Amino acid sequence: MPALRDFRRRIKSVKSTQKICKAMKAVATAKMARAQATVVAARPYARQLHEVLGRVASAARDVQNPLLTVREPKRVCYIVITADRGLCGGFNSNILRTAVKELSKWEEFKLVAVGRKCRNFFRFRDWERDAEFIGLGENIRFEQGQQIARFVINKYIAGEYDAVYMVYSKFVNMLVQQPTVVKLLPVEPPAEEAAEKAGGEEAAAPKKATVDYIFEPSAADVLDYLLPRYVENSVYHGLIESKASEQSARMMAMDAATKNAGEMIDRLTLQMNRLRQEGITKELLDIVGGAAALE
């Protein structure tokens, strides 16, 4: 029967799609585990750098550094980090929605697009981009974050940007990815007391005794060295957090797609069996009716 052939063809097609989604889920799960391990390993360094910057800034309060210079924000730059690929649920759309909301606050802004989805989104709207960073790969390297950071640092020092923000997805857990906006430039060093409490669990620790640090060659020189590293590490951290969020979102999306495909196969199979049963019943009735007529 033509209808039965159509059902079999549809079921075969859905089963093929289900296999692809299941394989993509397995790949995303493995990649998510690696990306999550990278994020967890990088967080202690980020906390410690945050704390050290607060101590050095407290010791060098009168130091003049270009990255600390606060200007009236007339020309702001946004680094927007998305994925290169889709099939990851609302991951990309959530980040882009947050970015558009932030950009609407300013009359003039510059864009640094990280990820093919971000580049295509702004290109479609004909929004000018100062730089594009595409194809960073699955294993983010510190040098990649360093390259992006140095680009905006040079622009900021040259006076082309008055402030720099970064929009990325913060990895909370496998189920939660939070679009986040952070200010990169001008750098706002934390107060020493706040920096010491920035480590979450460490906040509940007993208060440390005041320590008088000696900086060599000087606190100003140490601060000049730390500020660019702080920005570079912040960008790198945004990249790895976004990568972990992307893989988590893709894993959940493919898991949902696999389950939906299974439900669709069950519905189509049930409809096909009902149609086949109707055909068999009709044939039996015809046979019984023919036999009765012969009698």
UniProtKB/Swiss-Prot annotation:
Major location (coarse): membrane
Ion transport is among the record's keywords = yes
Q: Which InterPro entries match?
A: ATP_synth_F1_ATPase_gsu (IPR035968), ATP_synth_F1_gsu (IPR000131), ATP_synth_F1_gsu_CS (IPR023632)
Does the keyword section mention Membrane?
yes
Any GO BP annotation: proton motive force-driven plasma membrane ATP synthesis
User: Coiled-coil regions in this chain?
Assistant: none
> Which topology term describes how it sits in the membrane?
Peripheral membrane protein
Please list the GO terms describing molecular function. ATP binding; proton-transporting ATP synthase activity, rotational mechanism
Report keywords, A-Z: ATP synthesis, Cell membrane, CF(1), Hydrogen ion transport, Ion transport, Membrane, Transport
The UniProt entry, under SUPFAM superfamilies, shows:
ATP synthase (F1-ATPase), gamma subunit (SSF52943)
Q: Name one GO cellular component term.
A: proton-transporting ATP synthase complex
Q: Where in the cell is it found?
A: Cell membrane
PANTHER family assigned? ATP SYNTHASE GAMMA CHAIN, ATP SYNTHASE SUBUNIT GAMMA, MITOCHONDRIAL
Q: What does this protein do?
A: Produces ATP from ADP in the presence of a proton gradient across the membrane. The gamma chain is believed to be important in regulating ATPase activity and the flow of protons through the CF(0) complex.
Q: Which family does it belong to?
A: Belongs to the ATPase gamma chain family.
Q: How does it assemble?
A: F-type ATPases have 2 components, CF(1) - the catalytic core - and CF(0) - the membrane proton channel. CF(1) has five subunits: alpha(3), beta(3), gamma(1), delta(1), epsilon(1). CF(0) has three main subunits: a, b and c.
Sorted alphabetically, which NCBIfam families does this protein's record hold? ATPsyn_F1gamma
Protein name stated in the entry: ATP synthase gamma chain
Q: Which organism is it from?
A: Desulforudis audaxviator (strain MP104C)
Q: What is the lineage of its organism?
A: Bacteria, Bacillati, Bacillota, Clostridia, Thermoanaerobacterales
